[in-house]
Amino acid sequence: ISSPVSXLTIHPLRNIMDMLYVGXITI
């Protein structure tokens, strides 16, 4: 996964989904 900033700029929805996915695994 590239830097969160670039991912957020290029694919905001994709970045949010990744954050939720990773957050679910972490929690």
Curated annotation (Swiss-Prot):
Keywords: Aspartyl protease, Glycoprotein, Hydrolase, Protease. It is an enzyme of class 3 (hydrolase). The keyword Protein biosynthesis does not apply. Glycosylated. Placenta. GO terms for molecular function: aspartic-type endopeptidase activity. Signal peptide: none annotated. Coiled coil: none annotated. Its EC number is 3.4.23.-. GO terms for biological process: proteolysis. Belongs to the peptidase A1 family. This is Pregnancy-associated glycoprotein 55. It comes from Capra hircus (Goat). The lineage of its organism: Eukaryota, Metazoa, Chordata, Craniata, Vertebrata.
